[in-house]
C-alpha cells in the first residue's frame, strides 16, 4: 500500500447512532464531504481548563470520556481494551461501528500508512456522521471511494481523511490548550470547548482520549469540511 507524506489515521469506536442523530444538524454542510455539525454549547476555547495533559498525548483506557463512550463494545478487538495494543487502522477495522471510515481508509490505500505512523491524533467520524453526509449529498460516498485517482495521495478522499489527522499525539487537554492544530492535509483544525467537552471545528467529541498503539482517537459527530483552497 502507498505511503503518503501526511500519514493519516482514522480510528476507533463508538457507534452513537442515537447520540449523533440527536445532535447533528445545526451547521451548514460544506461541499465535498461534510456532514452537518451539531451545535455545541462549549465551542469557544476555555482559559480555565485545568486538566493536565498526559505525557506525549498518550492516554490510557481509564482516560476515555464522552457521552457516547457507553456505545463502545465492552469486549473483543473493537473494545477500548482490545484497541489499545493495535495500530490505529487495524483498531478501527476491528470495530463494527466504524465501518464507513474503515472502507474509506481501504479505498484510499491508507491502511499501512496509518498503521506505521509513529504518532497520530485522529478525529474519527462515526458511521452516523457519514450517513448524515450522504443524506445531504446523495451519492457522495460512492463518488469519493470509486474515483479513478482514489488511491492517490492527492485524491479528494485522501485529502478529506488526512484533514482528520494530526502527526502528533494529543490528549483532550492538549488539543484544547493548542487551540489550533496542523492537519496532515495541511489545513488548520480549530479546537474549542474544554478538556472535558472539546469541539473540533465546532463538532462535538462523542468519545475521546481513546488509545491505540500509535494514536489517540477522538470519535466525532461530523465529517469535517475541507477549508476552501
Predicted segments with their positions:
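Mature, structured domains of secreted/extracytosolic soluble proteins
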Residues: 2-229
Amino acid at each position: 500500500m502507498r505511503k503518503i507524506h501526511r500519514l493519516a489515521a482514522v480510528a476507533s469506536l463508538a457507534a452513537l447512532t442515537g447520540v449523533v442523530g440527536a445532535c447533528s444538524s445545526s451547521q451548514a454542510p460544506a461541499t465535498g464531504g461534510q456532514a452537518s455539525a451539531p451545535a455545541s454549547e462549549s465551542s469557544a476555547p476555555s482559559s480555565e481548563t485545568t486538566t493536565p495533559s498526559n505525557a506525549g498525548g498518550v492516554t490510557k483506557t481509564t482516560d476515555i470520556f464522552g457521552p457516547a463512550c457507553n456505545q463502545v463494545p465492552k469486549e473483543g478487538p473493537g473494545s477500548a481494551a482490545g484497541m489499545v495494543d493495535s495500530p490505529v487502522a487495524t483498531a478501527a477495522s476491528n470495530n463494527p461501528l466504524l465501518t464507513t471510515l474503515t472502507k474509506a481508509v481501504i479505498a484510499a490505500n491508507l491502511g499501512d500508512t496509518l498503521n506505521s505512523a509513529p504518532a497520530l491524533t485522529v478525529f474519527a467520524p462515526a458511521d452516523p456522521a457519514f450517513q448524515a453526509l450522504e443524506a445531504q449529498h446523495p451519492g457522495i460516498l460512492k463518488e469519493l471511494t470509486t474515483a479513478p485517482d482514489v488511491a492517490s495521495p492527492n485524491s479528494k478522499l485522501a485529502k478529506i481523511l488526512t484533514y482528520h489527522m494530526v502527526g502528533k499525539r494529543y490528549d483532550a487537554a492538549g488539543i484544547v490548550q493548542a487551540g489550533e492544530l496542523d492537519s496532515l492535509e495541511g489545513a488548520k483544525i480549530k479546537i474549542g470547548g474544554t478538556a472535558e467537552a472539546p469541539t473540533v471545528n465546532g463538532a462535538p467529541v462523542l468519545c475521546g482520549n481513546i488509545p491505540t498503539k500509535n494514536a489517540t482517537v477522538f470519535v466525532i459527530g461530523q465529517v469535517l469540511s475541507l477549508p476552501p483552497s
